[in-house]
Amino acid sequence: MSTDLQHIRIGLTNNHPCSYLPERQERVAVALDAELHTEQNYQLLMANGFRRSGDTIYKPHCERCHACQPIRISIPDFVLSRSQKRLLSKAKSLRWEMKTEMDAEWFELYSRYICKRHKNGTMYPPKRDEFSRFAQTTWLTTLFLHIYDESNQLLGVAVTDVMAQCSSAFYTFFEPDYPLSLGTLAVLYQVNYCQQNNEQWLYLGYQIDECPAMNYKTRFQRHQRLVNQRWQG
């Protein structure tokens, strides 16, 4: 870990059922020091595998499992794949816009997404206040990437933490029955935002190879994974 973070206080949660891999137990390490709640410190913490949920900064610390690997895209080295080029071509009629607040109709879209895609997950049933506590924080700049169609219909929202050297794709929800891959498209738009702002990295959270729903993250080149506290890729 970075020498600036050698002496932070860490608390461990109890083991509980894993949200992603059935029949496995999950445990997380939580950074306890409130002074870590700054943009500069959070950039260092993300580079060392941490992530946030609301104001809580954590990283997986499971006893018998190391499936969660932090993953990030190197923005200067990013290269579109053929399938991503095709997706952008099909999405020419769509547009994206970064905003400081979500549009008024966000919760209806979020509810459709959760009820269709994650009915067995921890965020079901969808609750407005619960999502707001999960997504927002008081010590980071959090922006909301909105995706619209040609009739200005809201198709997706990508919650994005924005910092000086990097951004973090925090959470994305979208129209579940739309015929294009809106989740992938949201990441491509976030990459575009990072390029426009001369950022180095876009963090995508954790990659779990055994979880098929996450494997889209590995299709972004050039990505890196944090393995044994070293970024590789």
Swiss-Prot record:
<dbReference type="InterPro" id="IPR007471">
    <property type="entry name" value="N-end_Aminoacyl_Trfase_N"/>
</dbReference>
<keyword id="KW-0963">Cytoplasm</keyword>
<dbReference type="InterPro" id="IPR017138">
    <property type="entry name" value="Asp_Glu_LeuTrfase"/>
</dbReference>
<comment type="function">
    <text>Functions in the N-end rule pathway of protein degradation where it conjugates Leu from its aminoacyl-tRNA to the N-termini of proteins containing an N-terminal aspartate or glutamate.</text>
</comment>
<dbReference type="GO" id="GO:0071596">
    <property type="term" value="P:ubiquitin-dependent protein catabolic process via the N-end rule pathway"/>
</dbReference>
<keyword id="KW-0012">Acyltransferase</keyword>
<keyword id="KW-0808">Transferase</keyword>
<dbReference type="InterPro" id="IPR007472">
    <property type="entry name" value="N-end_Aminoacyl_Trfase_C"/>
</dbReference>
<dbReference type="InterPro" id="IPR030700">
    <property type="entry name" value="N-end_Aminoacyl_Trfase"/>
</dbReference>
<dbReference type="Pfam" id="PF04377">
    <property type="entry name" value="ATE_C"/>
</dbReference>
<dbReference type="GO" id="GO:0004057">
    <property type="term" value="F:arginyl-tRNA--protein transferase activity"/>
</dbReference>
<dbReference type="GO" id="GO:0008914">
    <property type="term" value="F:leucyl-tRNA--protein transferase activity"/>
</dbReference>
<protein>
    <recommendedName>
        <fullName>Aspartate/glutamate leucyltransferase</fullName>
        <ecNumber>2.3.2.29</ecNumber>
    </recommendedName>
</protein>
<dbReference type="InterPro" id="IPR016181">
    <property type="entry name" value="Acyl_CoA_acyltransferase"/>
</dbReference>
<dbReference type="Pfam" id="PF04376">
    <property type="entry name" value="ATE_N"/>
</dbReference>
<dbReference type="GO" id="GO:0005737">
    <property type="term" value="C:cytoplasm"/>
</dbReference>
<comment type="similarity">
    <text>Belongs to the R-transferase family. Bpt subfamily.</text>
</comment>
